[in-house]
């Protein structure tokens, strides 16, 4: 799509979102989690359950309780799987790389390994934090697969899952409702989530990447386009602005992902997105796939988005 039409399309999208929110261009925020009414007249092929209605999101029927859709959970042996299990065009090229591993918060319930992948040539550095919420499984499944990525240039840091205890127990929280993604920049002397947030934040500060990817999933459904699933969130983009909107438009043009994505911002206070952008001046993109879709579709979307950026930056 020519850039002038893309800019026009972006303007129309922003106008639509702003009219729904009643805001001005400087007041772009994530969507309110307000339930929407599901149509009882729509033809459905799903068997309903007590307390659940049927909604259709991007052509897919799913069950909805008035606030959240029913999670399409799947326990995959992800470390035995390959990129090709989620798409024939994913990470097909192979390049020689060097790798090293190190651990954050050693000996704690939050202990997590960071894998550092280095291509043969110098280039951009990307830091991927996948699964700060442990029950957002497609996010950290994608992160586990990305540990097998190779690069022709540049460097990749991958921590997946970032919330190891939450992933182990399939819960959003680290423990006792401690939300890792509301704990940044964290504290060396705080609770478990705050200590882990601090370790991740300090590692990003040390590495100084060009971009941070924050891989997530959403389960709350509101109405139409105004819900968090299938979205890209940013706070400050800096030099990554053109790349971000080219990525967004690629989903809307049908070039990328199973359905179009929309954008929101800024990231919430205490989130990795908001904190690294405002305190370190490093652009961060939060990817939110939608948990009402089947797991393969969600993992594939996460991988396609990361691959798009790596190719955009000529790292692959």
What are these regions (language model features)?
Residues 21-30:
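Bacterial lipoprotein signal-peptidase II cleavage site
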Residues 1-8:
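Bacterial N-terminal signal peptides that target proteins for export
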């Amino acid at each position: 799509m020519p850039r002038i039409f893309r800019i026009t399309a972006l303007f129309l999208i922003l106008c639509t979102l702003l009219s729904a929110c009643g805001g001005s261009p400087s007041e772009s925020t994530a969507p309110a989690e307000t339930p929407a009414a599901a149509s009882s007249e729509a033809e459905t092929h799903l068997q309903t359950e007590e307390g659940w209605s049927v909604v259709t999101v991007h052509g897919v029927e799913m069950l909805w309780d008035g606030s959240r859709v029913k999670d399409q959970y799947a326990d995959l042996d992800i470390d035995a799987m390959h990129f090709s299990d989620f798409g024939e065009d994913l990470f097909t090229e192979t390049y020689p790389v060097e790798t090293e591993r190190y651990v954050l918060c050693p000996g704690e319930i939050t202990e997590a390994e960071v894998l550092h992948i280095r291509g043969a040539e110098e280039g951009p550095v990307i830091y991927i934090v996948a699964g700060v919420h442990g029950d957002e499984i497609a996010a950290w499944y994608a992160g586990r697969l990305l540990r097998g990525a190779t690069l022709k240039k540049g460097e990749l840091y991958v921590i997946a899952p970032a919330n190891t205890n939450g992933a182990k127990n399939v819960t959003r929280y680290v423990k006792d409702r401690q939300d890792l993604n509301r704990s940044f920049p964290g504290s060396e002397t705080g609770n478990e989530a705050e200590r882990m947030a601090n370790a991740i934040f300090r590692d990003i500060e040390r590495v100084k990447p060009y971009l941070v990817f924050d891989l997530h999933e959403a389960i709350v459904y509101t109405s139409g386009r105004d819900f968090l699933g299938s979205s890209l969130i940013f706070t400050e983009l800096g030099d990554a602005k053109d790349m971000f909107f080219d990525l967004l438009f690629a989903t809307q043009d049908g070039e990328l992902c199973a359905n179009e994505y929309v954008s929101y911002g800024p990231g919430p206070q205490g989130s990795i997105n908001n904190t690294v952008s405002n305190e370190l001046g490093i652009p961060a993109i939060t990817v939110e796939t939608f948990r009402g879709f089947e797991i393969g579709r969600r993992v594939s979307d996460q991988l396609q988005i990361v691959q798009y950026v790596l190719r955009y930056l000529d790292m692959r």
